[in-house]
Amino acid sequence: VGTKKPNPWGLYDMHGNVAEWTLDQYIPTAYNQRETKVKNPYEIPTKTYPRTVRGGAWTDAAQRLRSAARRPSSSKWKKRDPQIPKSKWWHTDAPFVGFRIVRPVEVPSPEEQKKYWSYESN
């Protein structure tokens, strides 16, 4: 981790073998709805699917192998999940998707945590 140079935004290790499954709700027109500069473009989820999957994977064509590439997630990616209830995190039928473990510098308040994770109860 962090053995290569950072990208122009100071982020390390942004590209790998799989696309990144994020918590953001997927909105196809999200970039068109934005102001010119956005500090935190997080789209608060209102449902479990679709989520935004960013970047490319080993299965993708060259034009998708960039951080800006976006696609929606699908509940079909859990079709063969043997768990009952199905896992929130395991995409049995999407070996091209992974996730990045991150944490905030400051621990969010209980209210912020509830807001952030409340989509799971929908």
State each model region's role.
Residues 6-9:
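Short loop/turn microsegments at loop-to-beta-strand junctions
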Residues 3, 14-122:
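Surface-exposed recognition segments
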